[in-house]
């Protein structure tokens, strides 16, 4: 370990910043946020420094650097564009045993400043030891996407509760189990974010008084159409908190690699060597795991409420009194069309979109007359095997045989394949494709040649 990570208490302590440019301005913001008494020394200052000085937030000393400016300082930062001046600041600070950071020169510095994820009072710092600041920044951005914005509010609220929790629960183990329940409670987090004080109080009281045995719950999470980058931030947070993840074949391996490592994984899809698990059995798996007190994520491709049978699964949980929540996902129609260069709506060609399933419960029948009208886009989910029937029904109800049509296989994935032609050729196009695939019918398909961006990357 080349550096010892520490967090400095600088409130009301004197700090010197040498430099008055944009870089120095960024450092000044950090020092001010930490509550330091900041003196800034430079030949010239950006307008923001003058604003701060006029507001008596810091002190400006215009002129050449002199070592005596470091007297009584706890910490110094050299942030000029003059290497000689930066070296002078570093040497003067070293002589006085004052920690000094030198921007872009870690070897001259006695401390370095990390990339920061600020969820005050929770702080996360990332550093490469000055060897690769860009890598540290990229890691910070990844962590920013994972850590919920409300964490700071939650941490502050937990601080207010500490005395009561210590009084309520006699042992360290009981207190730990309570905090674990509190920090993963979505309702409390949302109430804090909405500043709903009554809901916060009610939820807290429930957590404090209910048995400490963890109450199971189920979260339906939409994984999106395939590309792991299209998974929502909330979806990512949920799969990283899960005790068990129940998933199907439409969830990509890249997304499964993001699941919490020690979570149990239950595959319920249909894949080579596996038989599809009946829906009723899936419902019972969710129910059984939640009744064990586990946090269950039902991870579905696309959006769980768009041909994902999410409603059926939640009805079972509702009847059993199991708490549940839903995290929407990008549905296949939206993702596949965007990655294929096919806008679902367009002022000249389509004023509406119809999302249609290729499967109906026994006895169901589509309203083909309404589907065959102009100025709309049709998107058929799970319709590949029904392509001949879709072609026949639409043409029989008046849709032109030359209506543009496309089929998207493995949409949004690097293996995405798209074929396009006309409605009259739909059965022939389908023979070239494999599931999972989506059928798109409408004049907007004709824009694909112009707007196809993904395959060109």
UniProtKB/Swiss-Prot annotation:
The active site is at 248 (proton acceptor), 270 (proton donor). It catalyses: uroporphyrinogen III + 2 S-adenosyl-L-methionine = precorrin-2 + 2 S-adenosyl-L-homocysteine + H(+); precorrin-2 + NAD(+) = sirohydrochlorin + NADH + 2 H(+); siroheme + 2 H(+) = sirohydrochlorin + Fe(2+). Its EC number is 2.1.1.107, 1.3.1.76, 4.99.1.4. SUPFAM superfamilies: NAD(P)-binding Rossmann-fold domains (SSF51735), Siroheme synthase middle domains-like (SSF75615), Tetrapyrrole methylase (SSF53790). Keywords: Cobalamin biosynthesis, Lyase, Methyltransferase, Multifunctional enzyme, NAD, Oxidoreductase, Phosphoprotein, Porphyrin biosynthesis, S-adenosyl-L-methionine, Transferase. InterPro entries: 4pyrrol_Mease, 4pyrrol_Methylase_sf, 4pyrrole_Mease_sub1, 4pyrrole_Mease_sub2, CobA/CysG_C, NAD(P)-bd_dom_sf, Siro_Cobalamin_biosynth, Sirohaem_synt_dimer_dom_sf. NAD(+) binds at residues 22-23, 43-44. Residues 1-204 are annotated as: Precorrin-2 dehydrogenase /sirohydrochlorin ferrochelatase. PANTHER family: SIROHEME SYNTHASE (PTHR45790:SF1), SIROHEME SYNTHASE-RELATED (PTHR45790). This is Siroheme synthase 2. It comes from Klebsiella pneumoniae subsp. pneumoniae (strain ATCC 700721 / MGH 78578). The lineage of its organism: Bacteria, Pseudomonadati, Pseudomonadota, Gammaproteobacteria, Enterobacterales.
């Amino acid at each position: 370990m080349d550096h010892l990570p520490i967090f400095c208490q600088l409130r009301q302590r004197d700090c010197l910043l040498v430099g008055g440019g944009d870089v120095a301005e960024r450092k000044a913001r950090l020092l001010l946020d930490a509550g330091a008494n900041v003196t800034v020394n430079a030949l010239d200052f950006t307008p923001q420094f003058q604003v701060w000085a006029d507001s008596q937030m810091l002190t400006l000393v215009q002129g050449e650097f002199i070592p005596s400016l470091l007297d009584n300082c706890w910490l110094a930062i050299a942030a000029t564009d003059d290497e000689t001046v930066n070296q002078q600041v570093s040497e003067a600070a070293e002589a006085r045993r004052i920690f000094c950071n030198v921007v872009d020169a870690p070897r001259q510095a006695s401390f370095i400043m990390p990339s920061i994820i600020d969820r005050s009072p929770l702080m996360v710092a990332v550093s490469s030891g000055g060897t690769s600041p860009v890598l540290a920044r990229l890691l910070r951005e990844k962590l920013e996407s994972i850590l919920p914005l409300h964490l700071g509010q939650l941490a502050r609220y937990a601080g207010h509760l500490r005395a009561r929790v210590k009084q309520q629960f006699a042992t360290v183990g009981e207190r730990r189990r309570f905090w674990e329940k509190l920090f993963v409670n979505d309702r409390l987090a949302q109430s804090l974010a909405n500043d709903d004080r009554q809901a916060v109080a009610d939820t807290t009281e429930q957590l404090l008084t209910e048995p400490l045995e963890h109450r199971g719950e189920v979260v339906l999470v939409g994984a999106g159409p395939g590309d792991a980058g299209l998974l929502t931030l909330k979806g990512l947070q949920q799969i990283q908190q899960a005790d068990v993840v129940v998933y199907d074949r439409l969830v990509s391996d890249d997304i499964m690699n993001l699941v919490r490592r020690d979570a149990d994984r239950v595959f319920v899809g249909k894949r080579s060597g596996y038989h599809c698990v009946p829906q009723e059995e899936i419902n019972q798996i969710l129910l059984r795991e939640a009744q064990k007190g586990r946090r269950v994520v039902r991870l579905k491709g696309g959006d769980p409420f768009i041909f994902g049978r999410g409603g059926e699964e939640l009805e079972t949980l509702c009847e059993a009194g199991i708490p549940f929540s839903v995290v929407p996902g990008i549905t296949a129609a939206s993702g596949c069309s965007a990655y294929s260069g096919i806008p679902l709506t367009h002022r000249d060609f389509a004023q509406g979109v119809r999302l249609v399933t290729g499967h109906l419960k026994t006895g169901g029948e589509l309203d083909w007359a309404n589907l065959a009208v102009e100025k709309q886009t049709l998107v058929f989910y799970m319709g590949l095997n029904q392509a001949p029937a879709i072609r026949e029904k639409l043409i029989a109800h008046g849709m032109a045989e030359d209506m543009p049509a496309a089929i998207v296989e493995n949409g949004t994935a690097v293996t995405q394949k798209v074929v396009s032609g006309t409605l009259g050729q739909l059965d022939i196009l389908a023979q070239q494709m494999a599931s999972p695939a989506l059928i798109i019918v409408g004049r907007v398909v004709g824009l694909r040649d112009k707007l196809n961006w993904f395959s060109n990357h």
